[in-house]
């Protein structure tokens, strides 16, 4: 399991050459990663940022089988408590991974255009309240097809000082943006690349009054 961003030594890299390069079936390995200052938010970042981690043994095949996840790191002194890392300057954090899972060796029928592994609106649980502070952690992974333009209907986000309603992510890139919902209702969240959206890379999320 290979992480991005955090501090690790060779045995905890999760790639060729270290003790943790691979874990055999039925075996265990404990990785040690450090969220040091260089892994946390930079001066121009929001108070929490996102990193990816994923398999690096048969990277392409195993990532396409779902061996991928995210880490969120909060700036030192900004967490609500030792047991609650949610930053004090936001009310909620959401994480979304935009990825085309390739399950059948590039055959179109095996390309699953997903948000968090779900497509065609089958992603539940994303609700916020009007006027609350919401941070969206957005990531992408995959191949040259995984250039995504993430679009929120009805709302805008603040992305590194820039106001927009679309953010761009490339394969293995990550970004964190802030939103204060201003319009209640059920809203689309989707990739604005036309064939990605039509193939199912879209869902609804809810803003409560």
Where are the regions a protein language model picked out?
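Copper-binding active sites and cupredoxin-like electron-transfer domains
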Residues: 1-209
